[in-house]
Amino acid sequence: MAQQRRGGFKRRKKFDYIAANKIEYVDYKDTELLSRFVSERGKILPRRVTGTSAKNQRKVTTAIKRARVMALMPYVNED
């Protein structure tokens, strides 16, 4: 039997931001887009958090790693 949640909290539906905006190529120079997929500490967020598809997650990960090598994005954000 399924139990109902208490408190009425409804979880937000995750969607693939890249597919929804019809972005074909994830550019490593577009740091504004890539910063959506990085935590405040600088770690790449997993698919279960961002809601991206596996294919687009690979594109994002590759672009973030390229941006880090080119010094466009930091490896670690320290406060």
From Swiss-Prot:
InterPro entries: Ribosomal_bS18, Ribosomal_bS18_CS, Ribosomal_bS18_sf. One of its GO terms (cellular component) is cytosolic small ribosomal subunit. One of its GO terms (molecular function) is structural constituent of ribosome. Keywords: Ribonucleoprotein, Ribosomal protein, RNA-binding, rRNA-binding. One of its GO terms (biological process) is translation. It comes from the Bacteria. Signal peptide: none annotated. PROSITE patterns: RIBOSOMAL_S18. SUPFAM superfamilies: Ribosomal protein S18. The keyword RNA-binding applies. Part of the 30S ribosomal subunit. Forms a tight heterodimer with protein bS6. Binds as a heterodimer with protein bS6 to the central domain of the 16S rRNA, where it helps stabilize the platform of the 30S subunit. Belongs to the bacterial ribosomal protein bS18 family. PANTHER family: 30S RIBOSOMAL PROTEIN S18, SMALL RIBOSOMAL SUBUNIT PROTEIN BS18M. NCBIfam families: S18. This is Small ribosomal subunit protein bS18. It comes from Streptococcus thermophilus (strain ATCC BAA-250 / LMG 18311).
